[in-house]
From Swiss-Prot:
This is Penicillin-binding protein activator LpoB. It comes from Escherichia coli (strain K12). The gene is lpoB. Belongs to the LpoB family. Its main location: membrane. A lipid is attached at residue 20 (S-diacylglycerol cysteine). The lineage of its organism: Bacteria, Pseudomonadati, Pseudomonadota, Gammaproteobacteria, Enterobacterales. Residues 1-19 form the signal peptide. GO terms for biological process: peptidoglycan biosynthetic process; regulation of cell shape.
Length: 213
């Protein structure tokens, strides 16, 4: 009887405790309130740097072609040989010319109203007198050295008959051939004079027309 009473007491106690647990109210849940929003700080305006105005590029000076430039000189070609050969033949057969004498051929002097290649004319004249059988020509090197002594370039003409005779004496020549082109440059006239160096006497002269090629 005693054991049964204990068992019943324990059972009743257990049921009582279970009922108490079931009737316990749940713990209150605290409501989480959102934190108050902080007012945003006003943003400071970013200072703007004023843009530098673009300076328009200044136009450069207007270049004009030089309208005053002289035109290129017209190059003329002459038939020097055609004009010189007949005169050289007459000179070699002239009276008073001693065979074997030394002849100085001066550069052709341009006395026309324009520009012409006097060096070409001089070279043609020397070629026409080469191997002539009567004169020994003063070499171009000897003539060049004699001109340099007078302060002239090898291409310069002596200009006057007196200078030509003076040069001829310095190089030991007996005769000097003085030549000049004169008149209109488009149709010049070639004049040749053979002079005796010792006296300056003109022992032969001739002239002829020079045509362009």
């Amino acid at each position: 009887m005693t054991k049964m009473s204990r068992y019943a007491l324990i059972t009743a106690l257990a049921m009582f405790l279970a009922g108490c647990v079931g009737q316990r109210e749940p713990a209150p849940v605290e409501e989480v309130k959102p934190a108050p929003e902080q007012p945003a700080e006003p943003q400071q305006p970013v200072p703007t740097v004023p843009s530098v105005p673009t300076i328009p590029q200044q136009p450069g000076p207007i270049e004009h072609e030089d309208q005053t430039a002289p035109p290129a000189p017209h190059i003329r070609h002459y038939d020097w040989n055609g004009a010189m050969q007949p005169m050289v033949s007459k000179m070699l057969g002239a009276d008073g010319v001693t065979a074997g004498s030394v002849l100085l051929v001066d550069s052709v002097n341009n006395r026309t109203n324009g520009s012409l290649n006097a060096a070409e004319a001089t070279e043609t004249l020397r070629n026409a007198l080469a191997n002539n059988g009567k004169f020994t020509l003063v070499s171009a090197q000897q003539l060049s050295m004699a001109k340099q002594q007078l302060g002239l370039s090898p291409q310069d003409s002596l200009g006057t008959r007196s200078k030509a005779i003076g040069i001829a004496r310095n190089v030991g020549a007996h005769y000097v051939l003085y030549s000049s082109a004169s008149g209109n440059v488009n149709a010049p006239t070639l004049q040749m004079q053979l002079m005796l160096v010792q006296t300056g006497e003109i022992i032969w002269s001739g002239k002829g027309a020079v045509s362009q090629q």
